[in-house]
């Protein structure tokens, strides 16, 4: 999602990209096998990684010259950071489609995808707690159209129109 907003002229940052900078891919794969089967190990990893991610996000926001910046945080509600932002956008998809996409684009097994989804807040709850909701249940082109429409709404709202 960050890329699509960036293509529309917004300055963006993505929490997942920060994690990818902190933890090498082979280490992420190894850790995933542990943390998605061991809640205590997951909490320990999050306690180490989340403060670094939050610090980088706060630094990014503080250094922006173009407003509003777009910050993508897939686990926003789970980590309790929604108060850092003026508005919250949530992208939701049906669970079966999430699983299908995770398996086809990331190479996860169905079991791995299901464990990742189960470790997160249900999308319905995220949607209720959000200011804007984008339903991503179609093509990339349709998603881009929805993001472009929302980008215009955000610009209008930010300008006070």
Where do the language-model regions lie?
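Well-ordered beta-strand positions
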Residues: 11, 33, 87, 131-132
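ATP-dependent small-molecule kinase phosphotransfer cores
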Residues: 11-67
């Amino acid at each position: 999602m960050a890329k699509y907003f960036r293509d529309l002229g917004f300055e963006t940052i993505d929490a997942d990209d920060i994690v990818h900078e902190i933890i090498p891919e082979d280490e992420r794969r190894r850790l995933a096998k542990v943390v998605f089967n061991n809640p205590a190990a997951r909490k320990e990893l999050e306690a180490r990684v989340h403060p670094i991610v939050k610090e980088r996000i706060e630094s990014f926001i503080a250094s922006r010259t173009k407003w509003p910046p777009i910050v993508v945080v897939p686990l926003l509600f789970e980590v309790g950071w929604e108060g850092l932002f003026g508005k919250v956008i949530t992208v939701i998809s049906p669970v079966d489609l999430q699983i299908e996409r995770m398996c086809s684009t990331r190479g996860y097994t169905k079991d791995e995808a299901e464990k990742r989804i189960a470790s997160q807040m249900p999308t319905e709850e995220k949607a209720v707690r959000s200011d804007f909701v984008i339903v991503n249940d179609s093509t990339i082109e349709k998603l881009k159209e929805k993001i472009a429409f929302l980008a215009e709404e955000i610009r209008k709202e930010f300008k006070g129109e």
